[in-house]
């Protein structure tokens, strides 16, 4: 009876007749809500164009009307912003900012403990869950080093709190993992959970005229087939939202996109940091006419977590996370120290209501072919800064000096006009320029299809295929 009432309320909030798959998902969500097992969670998996985001937004709005408390989270700032917009403006947080707190300074970086979950009777909903990793490595400074483990531990530590994970299994899995563990029913059952899972595969009718979604759906269907052909053929005919751009027309076409939809809604997606660097330099020099290494108006992406500047400025956003985007407002005091180049920069954080922050940036990371400064560079910087305070007698005082040193805490950034697909994941742009470059014949077919699908689905209204091979078009 209660399930029927909740199903009806959810359906009414939907605004139009749901598809059969969406109706099943609504019914399952109602079953989940009335389920009394405290160790239960829900997975809502759906590919591009199936109405997954719309359904999640309906759930959030309906839960508000039903008096159910909800917390929205996503892996990146941009994804959290999109989740919030799709949910009627309900606040959304990045997972790291919600579940971790800074514990201690520990040499090269800080250490973060798992936060206490002080919520009660709350449903935690995580969008873009395909990006939630569970391997150690880059996350070593955070909690146990395994994000998914920590997320589950955090949520279920709260009284009567449960979790809903929403995502697309066809997207790229987290770096170093073969699949997305957070969307895998068996994996999540391994936490001792009763799992309510639903899948949305049918592209909703109003989206069927989209070439982006038509080809994304074809790519998803290819993932389950054993075929010898590595490179799939893209259908262009009859679709206004797909366009091939030869290399000699790229500058003009990018210029047109910047004029039509703006720089914030245009991005180049490519396969490597090296190619992203080439595109970023080409765009800055040729399209934007910028000769300085860094100047007002430049778009940047944070490539290493940094808590120092937000703490210093008492910012509400907690810390600057890998993947956060920012616009340069002013650049001052360029200087060389410790074998690296630095500058004081005023940033506008475009994923966080355009909050402004003054930081010191290490300029060397802008052009590095590595994802950020290398471990050797970070270690050398730490040791050089430590040597600056060699005359301070007490070790504890020396460490405090290093902890507050502007050079040691310099923000590591790259230009954000062109990014790798992993960096673009979790965001969408009106216009996406896709450069796949050379694909070696011995490449993993599965990896390539997931990469291509993820890249295709970053585009909202138009996808430009840069220098696309003729043998990949039908």
Regions found by a protein language model. Name each.
Residues 88, 283-287, 450-453:
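Short, solvent-exposed amphipathic alpha-helical segments in soluble enzyme
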Residues 5-6, 25-30, 37, 155-161, ...:
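Conserved helicase motor core of P-loop NTPases
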Residues 2-40:
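Conserved pre-motif I regulatory segment
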């Amino acid at each position: 009876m209660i399930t029927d009432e909740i199903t009806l309320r959810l359906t009414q909030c939907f605004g139009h007749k749901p598809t059969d798959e969406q109706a099943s998902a609504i019914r399952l969500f109602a079953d989940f809500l009335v389920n009394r097992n405290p160790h239960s969670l829900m997975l809502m998996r759906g590919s591009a164009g199936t109405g997954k985001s719309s359904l999640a937004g309906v759930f959030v709005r309906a839960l508000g009307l039903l008096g159910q408390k909800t917390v929205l989270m996503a892996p990146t700032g941009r994804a959290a912003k999109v989740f919030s917009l799709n949910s009627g403006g309900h606040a959304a947080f990045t997972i790291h900012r919600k579940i971790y707190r800074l514990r201690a300074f520990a040499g090269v970086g800080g250490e973060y403990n798992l936060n206490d979950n002080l919520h009660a009777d709350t449903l935690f909903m995580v969008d873009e869950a395909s990006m939630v990793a569970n391997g150690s490595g880059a996350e070593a400074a955070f909690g146990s080093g395994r994000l998914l483990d920590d997320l589950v531990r955090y949520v279920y530590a709260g009284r009567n709190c449960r979790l809903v994970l929403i995502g697309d299994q066809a997207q790229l899995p987290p770096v170093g993992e073969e699949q997305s563990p957070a969307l895998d029913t068996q994996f999540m059952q391994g936490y001792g959970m009763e799992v309510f899972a639903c899948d949305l595969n049918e592209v909703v009718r109003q989206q069927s005229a989209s070439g982006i979604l038509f080809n994304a759906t074809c790519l998803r269907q290819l993932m389950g087939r054993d075929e010898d052909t590595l490179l799939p053929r893209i259908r262009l005919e009859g679709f206004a939202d797909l366009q091939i751009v030869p290399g000699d027309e790229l500058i003009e076409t990018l210029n047109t996109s910047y004029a039509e939809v703006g720089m914030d809604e245009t991005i180049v997606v490519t396969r490597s940091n090296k190619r992203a660097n080439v595109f970023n330099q080409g765009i800055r020099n040729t399209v934007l006419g910028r000769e300085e290494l860094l100047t007002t108006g430049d778009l940047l992406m944070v490539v290493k977590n940094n808590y120092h500047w937000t703490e210093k400025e008492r910012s509400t956003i907690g810390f600057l996370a890998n993947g956060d985007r920012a616009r340069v407002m002013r650049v001052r005091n360029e200087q060389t120290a410790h074998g690296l180049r630095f500058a004081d920069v005023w940033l506008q954080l475009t994923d966080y209501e355009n909050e402004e922050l003054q930081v010191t940036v290490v300029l060397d990371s802008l052009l590095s072919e590595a994802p950020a400064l290398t471990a050797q560079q970070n270690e050398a910087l730490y040791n050089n800064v430590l040597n600056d305070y060699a005359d301070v007698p007490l070790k504890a005082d020396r460490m405090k000096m290093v902890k507050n040193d502007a050079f040691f805490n310099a923000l590591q950034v790259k230009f954000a006009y062109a990014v790798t697909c992993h960096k673009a994941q979790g965001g969408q742009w009106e216009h996406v320029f896709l450069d796949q470059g050379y694909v070696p014949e011995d490449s993993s077919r599965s990896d390539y299809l997931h990469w291509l699908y993820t890249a295709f689905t970053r585009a909202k209204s138009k996808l430009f295929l840069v220098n696309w091979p003729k043998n990949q078009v039908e």
